[in-house]
Amino acid sequence: MKYLTDEKLLIVGAGGMIGSNMAQTALMLGLTPNVCLYDIFEPGVHGVAEEMYHCAFEGANITWTVDPAEAFKDAKYIISSGGAPRKEGMTREDLLKGNCQIAAQFGDYIKEYCPDVKHVVVIFNPADVTALTALIHSGLKPSQLTSLAALDSTRLQSNLAKEFGVPQSKVTAAYTYGGHGEAMAVFASKTLIDGTPLAEKNLSAERWAEIKHATVQGGSAIIKLRGRSSFQSPAYNAVKMIEADMGGTKFTWPAGCYVNCDECGFKNVMMAMPTVIDVAGVHFTKPEGTPEEMAELQASYEHLCKMRDEIVSLGIVPPVDEWKKSNPNL
């Protein structure tokens, strides 16, 4: 089997549903034979490792551990789902304090054991703030750490495809930006449905509002249907993000990235933007939309600022003007 690289990929939270799916997806896509599975729950991560062995992936070197020093040492790529999952009735923001404390420790492990890591993807919620926490603590460059945000856009794409009875790939330029949560901003002014602008499809305002609501509540809908939070879609998209940095297909769905941009008017947050991930990391451009879309994005940014300020007040990260002491790259 041919692999993109032989460098070490670390899956954090590998004993869980997302983590185990990430491990299998990474090996099925041929990212690297050297995959380390890490979790604090030994029976879970041991069980996942055994299942991976039973898949008999050609040339694979799968290891597992509950020791962070062993796990993080020499890791060049990391995906972390190592936080508490969302349960029915919870918002992503409800997970803020506990998961940001986990993210702080995660960032500290990176700084201590694998400062030469190439790219890190954080996918445990609230992803914008856990990723920001990890970035501050890790010392990495902003281009080296991203958070999963693509699911909001793929859910929008899926909802529009179902609405108009077209293959999902025929819905283009349907994106969400800003926060990965209730305050996400939906951008559809440039959306095409099989080549036809959405604005020309005679969609009523009421129906469009329903589609937007279904997009924002897409994760909650999965919990109600399956009794647990999403795991297959986040696992696949997170692995595709890492694949892009390894030199595979560029990842062009929106990713959460660090934004400190006077031109954009957004300062010191992680948020979903128009992005590309490639071997040089993540790059963003300024979003373009209608005045209404830009107002939604501004509101989403302000919500992210409030969550950022909350983790500062909790002492999980230092005040913004002291971030450079923790991470000179910010």
Where are these regions (language model features)?
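Rossmann-like NAD(P)(H) cofactor-binding subdomain of soluble oxidoreductases
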Residues: 91-159
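A short, basic/flexible loop-to-alpha-helix module at the beginning of a structural domain
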Residues: 1-7
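Conserved glycine-rich cofactor-binding loop
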Residues: 15
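Conserved S-adenosyl-L-methionine
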Residues: 28-34, 139-142
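Conserved N-terminal Rossmann-fold NAD(P) cofactor-binding segment
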Residues: 6, 31-75, 309-311, 316
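C-terminal substrate-binding/catalytic lobe of Rossmann-fold NAD(P)-dependent dehydrogenases
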Residues: 138-143, 153-330
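N-terminal Rossmann-fold NAD(P) dinucleotide-binding loop
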Residues: 19-20
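Rossmann-like NAD(P)-binding element
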Residues: 55-119
